[in-house]
Amino acid sequence: MDIIAKLRDVSFDELHPNERLKVDSHYLYGTLEESLADRATGAVSDADTQLTKFHGFYQQDDRDLRDDRRHRKLEPLYSFMVRLRLPGGRVSPEQWLTLDDNARRYANGTLRITTRQTFQYHGVFKENLRGHLQALDKAMMDTIAACGDVNRNVICTANPHRSPIHRQVHDLAHEISAHLLPRTRAYHEIFLGEERVAGGPREAEDEVEPLYTRHYLPRKFKVALAIPPENDVDVFAHDVGFIADVQAGELKGFNVCIGGGMGMTHGEPATFPRLSDIVGYCTPDRVVAVAEAIMLVQRDNGNRHDRKQARLKYTVEALGVDGFRQEVEARLGEALSPARELTLTHNGDRLGWYQGEDGLWHYGLFVQNGRLADSDGGPQLMTGMREIAQAHDGDIVLTTNQNLIITQVPEARREVIDDLLDRYRMTVEATPLRRHAMACVAFPTCGLAMAESERYLPSLIDRLDAIMREAGLADDAIIVRMTGCPNGCARPYLAEIGFVGKTIGRYNLYLGGGFAGERLNKLYRENIDEATILEELTPLIRRYAVEREPGEAFGDFVVRTGIIAPTLAGREFHA
């Protein structure tokens, strides 16, 4: 039974309030035009704060200033975080210059690379939203469905110019994104000035959204594509994963994974991170159809009563893996083929110069926590990348580890890129520990943050690096991730060492994730400060240096030696 039939006789009083809001919005229009016109406040209406997400931006305020403004009887300093839809993370030099100009003209002067291979702008005031989005549109970019209860930015193993296989997989990411994009014209009419046609979306029936209907999805929906042996995308962490089967240089098909997701809520064991299950195999020409079928099963069966139980991972738990797969196959009209043996061996990005199969060169640039900014006395990443975009003809590609790649550089032009990297101090030395670390934004802009993350992790890495050097592990990588709340944006539950904020200056410490993103970690210590973090980790790192087996990763070591029990399934995460 589809969602329209299922909800026909259900009272909205039985559902989460967002379900009525979506239906009453008339395909995401709501009262956004009125909210944008209201100059008495920097905010939009309460209902519209939910609808802006579908259009790619969140209302936030500067939490560093919140108490001071309250004391002065001023409303919070509202602004918006604006996120791009950028499947596969590729932009041209011309598009980069637009991104750079928008950051300086409409936002806080920085760009933030996300763990979903796109950009976020912070500090965009309400009066600047239309100008910002219209400038992006002129450069053939948009923010549609970058947030909200829809298919989010589709990610894939980075750099389509590395090989023909990478290009094919990148193109599939674009096809999935285009196919699962909402069809309403609300974004174009409200923000881009497109003229509304009489009898348009506000009067139409559900054919406006043939896939989503007026109900849209119960929660966000995320898709990732990986090319073994690399698992840079953490393919098991998403609602849907496709793992490429490459034989003799030919893309034969994909293993299909369902049911991953990171978010949970502190103190609520019914919520948990979960890794996806491999349920079958499909050929490249069926990838889009499979993605659609999985999304429709979630649309029609996901929990619309409790948003904390609304992600696809909980639908898989409710229906069972086999039951969910059978629903997918019923919509496909065919069975998935048996999965193939495909091996993922490592996470992380290729940094520095490397050569593609066509002979052109690519430079992987480390960007600490994804923040592109000009720092006093340090890297001038915004200015440097602007200069590179002006001097370079090839694409710039983002990674899901918050780094970027300057692609398609001829041998004769490498010196030009090297000179610019040096001039703007962009190639800072970073240890393997730092290169494999990720943090979410958290304070001051994220309204969900309970503790610092991006602003704090670099200094904590300094202290952990000192412990690593003392133990003789300066050249070894351990995956460290931090988030300011339990929602999991930096995928901390896959880290070998994960930190999740509890309150200001205190974190839950998780250990035992798999180095290749194949195993969840588990809670080791709760609600601890930095001194306790270092007290706990120092002896473990020293033991690892002495007792590890050849080639053994830290996460595997702490599991093998009984320091932490392995998490073998999401529902066992809290056990």
From Swiss-Prot:
Siroheme binds at residue 489. Keywords: 4Fe-4S, Amino-acid biosynthesis, Cysteine biosynthesis, Heme, Iron, Iron-sulfur, Metal-binding, NADP, Oxidoreductase. Its cofactor is siroheme; [4Fe-4S] cluster. PROSITE patterns: NIR_SIR. It holds the Pfam family NIR_SIR_ferr. One of its GO terms (molecular function) is NADP binding. It catalyses: hydrogen sulfide + 3 NADP(+) + 3 H2O = sulfite + 3 NADPH + 4 H(+). One of its GO terms (biological process) is cysteine biosynthetic process. GO terms for cellular component: sulfite reductase complex (NADPH). Gene3D superfamilies: Sulfite Reductase Hemoprotein, domain 1. Disulfide bonds: none annotated. Binds 1 siroheme per subunit. Pathway: Sulfur metabolism; hydrogen sulfide biosynthesis; hydrogen sulfide from sulfite (NADPH route): step 1/1. It is an enzyme of class 1 (oxidoreductase). Its EC number is 1.8.1.2. [4Fe-4S] cluster binds at residues 440, 446, 485, 489. Signal peptide: none annotated. Alpha(8)-beta(8). The alpha component is a flavoprotein, the beta component is a hemoprotein. Component of the sulfite reductase complex that catalyzes the 6-electron reduction of sulfite to sulfide. This is one of several activities required for the biosynthesis of L-cysteine from sulfate. PANTHER family: SULFITE REDUCTASE [NADPH] SUBUNIT BETA, SULFITE REDUCTASE [NADPH] SUBUNIT BETA-RELATED. NCBIfam families: CysI, PRK13504.1. Belongs to the nitrite and sulfite reductase 4Fe-4S domain family. This is Sulfite reductase [NADPH] hemoprotein beta-component. The gene is cysI.
